[in-house]
């Protein structure tokens, strides 16, 4: 029988109904990297093992190595594009939680003002920019944190905390004024399903994920996420 709705039209009506496809491997295999950009123009930096500052760019078909971060680190977060990106937080080779922030101009990284609270395995608004970014949650030496900071292109400012401290939350979506915090782990290390919505000044708990999980991916906007 004929499908009631052609696949192409269904995909146009609901782009999240698509499928995953394999792409070319990065030049250096690693985990816990910072990511910035889109599915056809992306950039990754940092990661482990071993803990590195290596950065690579994706053009939709292949990866190319570019200039390294000044500070090697893993469990780091990022935002922006392949020509204007920001990388922040993480843990250094000595496993110290750091607040180091670096910006990318298309050819090299420059160290700028640090986060107020050094942390790793934090969250980021994936559609934010290198002049308007958001950092939330993560873990410092004392455990999971709830603190949130916004970046204005030159400095980080502490703003409203998450309702619950959690870390291992790379799953984030939206911008620095309209974002989602998705899943993660609580201070005991248990996976959680908690989702919070950010309006530019405060976080509000909303509907949970169907399956609790941490170290997940996130994409989209505050009102249409994956």
Please describe what each predicted stretch is:
Residues 1-226:
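Polar, enzyme-active/binding microenvironments
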